[in-house]
């Protein structure tokens, strides 16, 4: 980012905004390529199991970025995992205890509010965030950058629905 700031330092404000927007679009394309080749359910379980290791105790934010659809995250091998099926597995009880979990995937939280609360209760997550509709990659990247920063900067924050803000 430093080289970006130097290269646009003397340009007009509008030009800077366009340049930054283009930089976000390029970065989002790179992220999109990574997401497309990301994981299978087996890979997902491998990394989720690591959360039980003491060396991960300090991590209080779990950011899960996949393709998504109603109530599910989708893997590169064209399979999907229903959130409630994940939460209801005995080995996942309390898996996110005290942590904030963000699903950076389209429509994953398009489910009944009671089910989201049950997911939170079963996994013991502190907070669950994500999308109830399909979102474009650039907008979601910008929003998630803000969200991660807000969570990181504010220990005493409280969650609200975007519609309530």
What are these model-derived regions, one by one?
Residues 9-14, 68-72, 107-111, 134-136:
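Short acidic, S/G/P-rich loop/turn micro-motifs used as interaction or catalytic elements
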Residues 1-61, 80-82, 96-98, 102-104, ...:
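A domain-level signal for caspase-like cysteine endopeptidase catalytic cores
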Residues 49, 141-148:
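Short, surface-exposed amphipathic charged segments that create phosphate/polyanion-binding patches used
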Residues 44, 69, 131:
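Gly/Ser/Thr-rich helix-start
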Residues 153-165:
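A conserved mid-domain beta-alpha-beta active-site/ligand-binding segment of alpha/beta enzyme cores
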Residues 78-141:
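Catalytic cores of nucleophile-dependent amide-cleaving enzymes
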Residues 60-74, 127:
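Active-site microenvironments of hydrolase-like enzyme catalytic domains
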Residues 51, 151-152:
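Hydrophobic residues in alpha-helical segments
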